[in-house]
Structure formats: structure tokens, C-alpha cells
Amino acid sequence: MYHQNLISSTPNQNSNPHDWDIQNPLFSIHPSAEIPSKYPFMGITSCPNTNVFEEFQYKITNDQNFPTTYNTPFPVISEGISYNMHDVQENTMCGYTAHNQGLIIGCHEPVLVHAVVESQQFNVPQSEDINLVSQSERVTEDKVMFKTDHKKKDIIGKGQWTPTEDELLVRMVKSKGTKNWTSIAKMFQGRVGKQCRERWHNHLRPNIKKNDWSEEEDQILIEVHKIVGNKWTEIAKRLPGRSENIVKNHWNATKRRLHSVRTKRSDAFSPRNNALENYIRSITINNNALMNREVDSITANSEIDSTRCENIVDEVMNLNLHATTSVYVPEQAVLTWGYDFTKCYEPMDDTWMLMNGWN
């Protein structure tokens, strides 16, 4: 059943297309070959989408040879969600009649408002090109970060020095001196100025001593250590041919040797001929004794403070906080003053009277 009289602007399907110009003279529609709708069961009649308004808005020509777009329902996927409006445009100025269960549907909404409503109601899928560009940018950033980290790791080489590097360092020091280590490090791959300086002063200097330590050197080390402590740079200045690193390594090696002997329960406290070992042993014993005294002092002070706090609380509250003791309350002394009344005498001190609010 058709209810064409309900909407006057809805054209009749059986009417002549030329009559549409009379009903809507401003938006005239030129006749063209009809293409069946994609959903013929809904009874929606297709009409060309080449009116004057759309020609102005979408730059669509009225040439009959140009492909036209017809009013067809939006494609519906299996989940019941409409696609976006990429392939079909709604001819909002040309009404159509959908004979679905006797209903008449008219399209008179502006194109812009209709597009905004549709975009808000449904999830419009994002273009794949934009996703590809975003993914490519993230991949590029990851590659740049990986290359940057890789370069930072390659800046400082932690490997051992090779004989070739030692020879090159000796030649560069002879030509540039011992003050411009940054410039010297540029000649090495994966080395910095600090590494070149330490390598030169600790291993490659011509006047450096690599032989065993003598008793005179140990005695100088002991005397200077008594004054400056573990300042190896100051000690190395008093020992010609011994670098800061060599002095520190000699000290630590002697300590490890004493520790290993003590671990093996050998005669660790027997007198030694080495003066440095005896000195380090005495320092270790004195440090341990001093540490024990400090610990004992801290423990004693804490116990004194705890006892003092308990005494203060006992004096104020007349209570002993120790769990094994009980509160002592003096017994009442009963004195009889006659057969009519009895008077109780109860000895108490000032603290007990104060706690009970007695005057």
C-alpha cells in the first residue's frame, strides 16, 4: 500500500520525471537511466544525484555520460553497523519513498548535518594510509633510538689495550705531550681522554717502576699514610716511579693476603718481617677495637636511657613496667577505739595521695 498523500514533496514513482521540475523547480532533476537498488526488497526507488545543489557543492556534472550516484541504502555489515559515506552519497534534496511495511520515508535533511550526525553515531574507520604513516614513524623513531644507544655504547671501550694501541699512544704523547688527552683520544676508536691518561701514567711512562716493592718504599708508604690516610695521589708524589694506581693496588694486595691468611687459621698474629703487613694488621686491629668500643658505648647509652625512662615513669605513676613484678600496696592497719566504732589507719605517701586526689 502506498501513502503518497502524506508527504506532498515525495514524488510518485509512476509519475513522469518531468513533473518533478514542477514540484521542485529550483532543484530540477534530469531524467537518466534507472539503476536498480542494491536492496530491492525494501522498495526504494533510485534517482540520480545530479541536481543543481549537488552540482554546486560536489562539482558533479549533469552530463549523462558521467557516472551518477543513486540513492541506495548504506551498506550494512554482519554486525548491523553502517559503513561510512565513501561510496554512496545521500540525495537529501530529492525525496524517495521506501515501501517497507507501509512506511514512507522522506529525505529532506541538509547534507552537512546528515554527515555530521552519521559520523557521530557510528565509528568511522581510520584510513589505512594514516595508520601506515604512524607505524612507519614509530619504526623510524625506534631505529634512531637504537642507533643512538649503540653509538653511546661504542664511545667508551672497556676492553684491554692492545700493543698497537700502546705504540700509538706513546707516539702521540711524544708529539702532543701529556696535557692534551682529548686531542690524543681522537686518534683512538672507542677511547676517551681519561683512559689514555691513566694508561700512560700507570703503565707506559718511561720512569715507571714495575718491579717489587722495597722495604724503603714500604716504610715511606707507612709514614705518609699515617699523615694523609688513603690519599693515594699524595702518597704517589712521595714515591718516584710509583703511580697512584700502583700504590693503591699494592696496599689492597697486602690486605687481601692478610685476610686470606686469617681465613686459613694460620699464625695470623705472629710477627712478620714485612713492615707494611704489620702496619696494616695493627690498623685493622685498632679499627676493630675502636668499632667494638663504639658499639658497646652506644648499647650502654641506650640501656641507661631506657632505665632512666623506666625510673621516671615509676616515680610518677608508682608502677613498675617490668612484667615479672607486681604493684605493692601497703596493708591496712586496723585499730579499735572502742566497741562502738572502728577506725582504719592506712599509711600512704604523698604520691599515693596525689594520685587519688586526696588533700
UniProtKB/Swiss-Prot annotation:
What GO biological process term is on the record, naming one? Answer: endosperm development
Residues in the DNA-binding region annotation: 181-204, 232-255
Physiological role: Transcription activator that recognizes the motif 5'-TAACGG-3' in the promoter of target genes. Promotes vegetative-to-embryonic transition and the formation of somatic embryos from root explants in a WUS-independent manner. Together with MYB118, activates the transcription of S-ACP-DES2/AAD2 and S-ACP-DES3/AAD3 thus promoting the biosynthesis of omega-7 monounsaturated fatty acid in seed endosperm.
In this chain, the stretch annotated as Disordered covers 1-21
Q: Which organism is it from?
A: Arabidopsis thaliana (Mouse-ear cress)
What is the top-level taxon of the source organism?
A: Eukaryota
Q: What phenotype is described for loss of this gene? A: Single and myb118 myb115 double mutants do not show apparent developmental abnormalities. The endosperm oil of double mutant myb115 myb118 lacks omega-7 fatty acids.
Outline the inducing conditions.
Answer: Induced by LEC2 but repressed by MYB118.
The record, for PROSITE patterns, names: HTH_MYB
Composition bias (Polar residues) maps to 1-17
Organism phylogeny: Eukaryota, Viridiplantae, Streptophyta, Embryophyta, Tracheophyta
The record's section on InterPro entries has: Homeodomain-like_sf, Myb_dom, MYB_TF, SANT/Myb
PANTHER family noted in UniProt: MYB DOMAIN PROTEIN 100-RELATED (PTHR45614:SF273), MYB PROTEIN-RELATED (PTHR45614)
Major localization class: nucleus
Q: Which UniProt keywords apply?
A: Activator, DNA-binding, Nucleus, Repeat, Transcription, Transcription regulation
User: Where, per UniProt, does this protein localize?
Assistant: Nucleus
Tissue specificity, in the record's words, reads: Accumulates in reproductive organs (e.g. flowers and siliques). Expressed at very low levels in vegetative organs.
One cellular component (GO) term of this entry: nucleus
Annotated ranges, domain HTH myb-type:
153-208, 209-259
> Which GO MF term does the entry hold, naming one?
DNA-binding transcription factor activity
Against SMART domains, the record matches this protein to: SANT
What protein name applies here? Transcription factor MYB115
